[in-house]
Regions:
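Conserved SAM/SAH-binding loop
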Residues: 13
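Conserved catalytic-core motifs of eukaryotic protein kinase domains, centered on the activation segment
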Residues: 19-22
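Conserved N-terminal catalytic core of the sugar/cofactor nucleotidyltransferase
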Residues: 1-8, 16, 30, 34-106
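Conserved core of the sugar-phosphate nucleotidyltransferase
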Residues: 114-134
């Protein structure tokens, strides 16, 4: 598969992060002295377009991306209804539909990628069971 994009949703409030995301978009929370969104972006080749869905404190993320990743093709999509009734990941992906008319890799900004991401060769979906009792 030669042409694909990467979708990084970062529209929500990040409430699971508590005070870390109160005044900051969750994508900008620092991990090893670098915003977590940079860790995600840097796992993909520079020629791959990145689509970032933004809501809560989205302007901060846009400013950061322009400064830190000016050498990348990054499309920011503003999600108006990022919290409250009708909001959610499904709506966020739907709002990005216009920019994702090709295969894409879905990569949440709160997922730490430790290995290089292989170029997708087929369509696939991955999942993992999560113990919610922690």
């Amino acid at each position: 598969m030669n042409q694909y994009k990467v979708l990084i949703p970062s529209a929500g409030l990040g409430t699971r992060l508590g005070d870390f995301s109160k005044n900051l978009n969750k994508a900008l929370v620092s991990l090893d002295n670098k915003p977590v969104i940079s860790h995600v972006i840097e796992k993909f080749p520079k020629h791959i377009e990145i689509v970032v869905a933004l809501g809560h404190k989205g302007d901060l993320v846009k400013d950061y991306l322009q400064m830190a990743h000016s050498d990348r093709q990054i499309t920011c999509v503003d999600i108006e209804n990022y919290c409250g009734n009708g909001s959610g990941l499904g709506l966020t992906i739907l709002e990005c539909k216009e920019y994702l008319q090709c295969p894409f890799v879905f990569c949440p900004n709160d997922t730490v990628i430790l290995e290089e991401v292989p170029e997708p060769t087929t369509n696939w979906v991955g999942y993992a069971e999560v113990d919610n009792n922690h």
